[in-house]
Amino acid sequence: MADTPALIPQSDTTPRCWALIPCAGTGSRAGATGPKQYQLLAGKPMVLHTLAAFAAVPRIARTLVVVAPDDAFFASQTLTDARFLVAACGGSTRAASVLNGLNFLLGQGAARHDWVLVHDAARCLIRPDQIDQLIDACWQDDVGGLLALPLPDTLKRESLGRVAATLERADKWLAQTPQMFRLGSLLDALQVAGTTVTDESSAMEAMGLSPKLVPGSAQNFKVTYPQDFCLAEAVLMTRSSGDSAPQQSASEFKRASDMNFRIGEGWDIHALVAGRKLLLGGVEIPYHLGLLGHSDADVLLHAITDALLGAAALGDIGTHFPDTDARFKGADSLVLLTEAARRVRAKGFEIGNVDSTVIAQAPKLMPYMAAMRAQIALALALEVDQVNVKAKTAEKMGPVGLGQAMEARATVLLRKFI
């Protein structure tokens, strides 16, 4: 990367961090009557949740919201943080809005060597600590980078509505935002790449650069389709519930008796048979055998579901989703896990963390661990670092060791303020 120094602006002045939120889209895929970024989620417009996260990051000097020229939304809003700017310079594409916004920032005193974090308005679940994590990871980097997640699902190439091929996913990541680059470098890259690129990283890649991948969160998804609104609102409501819980002050320790802790244990085992998909932790794993069961037989999710229900004294998975009920024939275990978590929270509990183990002789599961954790965290409305998945073999002993079955164990911590 010998040409990098020529592209990256250099200065002796300490760079600042700016945030840029392109907010000029219409949100047609969301099925909303107006721009999706202004739809209410957990009691306030989606974009205001996004802005609140950036307002909580002291290292962000100013946050610019780029809206369409005829957008009057912010004229009716009172932005209490003086660091927010609104510019009616949105373009016909996302990249055009970003390009116009970068030029606007230069007019506001930003320098070419400053950092800019571009973030989708519809990624309203971003958290301040994730923004800080990206800044920490990229501050000394020659190029910059983006939040991203390893691809959790099997990737198919389509032709005429049918599967044409299954693609290798081990090196595939899902790009998220924020994406953090030097303002001048990104401006130059967008001018060269054009305004049809779908993210800032693509423009930088077109310049021959390799942005840094910084692990993000499964919760930091982009609200795109109608069903996404329900999931985003559930996460926001869960966070709101947690934020309203009693807090420990500097002068007062909270006694353990003020909080009700519950620990749940789950276990499950399923036989391996031909002709079934192998699903573990909500991730399809290439293998010549799959797990036999009434539902999709995801043994790991079943163990976690049992642990959740057990900790809340709500029985077990068979009580809530019996295999005698035709409604659960072939059921998606991620859906069952999400519903179990809802019932647990309805009793006033918060989920603290999940620890789990898959016992399988084959195949190798390590390449899929990150994707499993991401799927479980998303289903439970948790951060990825609240979910752990381990893999062990049975040392060729018993039905698991002989490759006839797979087993899973899980432990869950619940807590409730009393």
Swiss-Prot record:
It comes from Albidiferax ferrireducens (strain ATCC BAA-621 / DSM 15236 / T118) (Rhodoferax ferrireducens). It comes from the Bacteria. PROSITE patterns: ISPD, ISPF. Its EC number is 2.7.7.60, 4.6.1.12. The lineage of its organism: Bacteria, Pseudomonadati, Pseudomonadota, Betaproteobacteria, Burkholderiales. This is Bifunctional enzyme IspD/IspF. The record marks 29, 36, 294, 393 as: Transition state stabilizer. Residues 262-418 are annotated as: 2-C-methyl-D-erythritol 2,4-cyclodiphosphate synthase. InterPro entries: IspD (IPR001228), IspD/F (IPR026596), IspD/TarI (IPR034683), ISPD_synthase_CS (IPR018294), MECDP_synthase (IPR003526), MECDP_synthase_CS (IPR020555), MECDP_synthase_sf (IPR036571), Nucleotide-diphossugar_trans (IPR029044). It holds the Pfam family IspD. A divalent metal cation binds at residues 268, 270, 302.
